[in-house]
């Protein structure tokens, strides 16, 4: 997990640079924590309204975690620090979910 966290810190900075240079970049990484699980992560930049009162757009990005489920998990974020924290949390949550699934499978067999 530690290697994944360091990688996320670097990738968040790269993401911010890419979003500023290109109109609609899709930046993809494959995260492979030490426990052997892997996540394909795609960052997509979009323009979303900041609020109804302020008539201007701000760059944001959508994190799409491509898991084995039919529908990707999406989160709208605004800062690279939040990108890093969110991905770290999702990796932990996924690990917890897999642990529960393994325990359930062992109980039923």
Curated annotation (Swiss-Prot):
It holds the Pfam family BAGE. Its main location: secreted. Not expressed in normal tissues except in testis. Expressed in melanoma, bladder and lung carcinomas. Residues 1-17 form the signal peptide. Keywords: Secreted, Signal. GO terms for cellular component: extracellular region. It is found in: Secreted. Belongs to the BAGE family. Unknown. Candidate gene encoding tumor antigens. The ancestral BAGE gene was generated by juxtacentromeric reshuffling of the KMT2C/MLL3 gene. The BAGE family was expanded by juxtacentromeric movement and/or acrocentric exchanges. BAGE family is composed of expressed genes that map to the juxtacentromeric regions of chromosomes 13 and 21 and of unexpressed gene fragments that scattered in the juxtacentromeric regions of several chromosomes, including chromosomes 9, 13, 18 and 21. This is B melanoma antigen 3. The lineage of its organism: Eukaryota, Metazoa, Chordata, Craniata, Vertebrata. The gene is BAGE3.
């Amino acid at each position: 997990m530690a290697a994944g966290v360091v990688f996320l810190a670097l990738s968040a900075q790269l993401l911010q640079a890419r979003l500023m240079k290109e109109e609609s970049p899709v930046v993809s990484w494959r995260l492979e924590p030490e426990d052997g699980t892997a996540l394909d992560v795609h960052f997509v930049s979009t323009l979303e309204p900041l609020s109804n009162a302020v008539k201007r757009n701000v760059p944001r990005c959508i994190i799409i975690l491509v898991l084995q489920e039919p529908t990707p998990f999406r989160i709208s974020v605004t800062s690279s620090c939040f990108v890093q924290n969110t991905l770290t949390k999702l990796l932990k949550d996924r690990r917890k979910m897999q642990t529960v699934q393994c325990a359930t499978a062992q109980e039923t067999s």
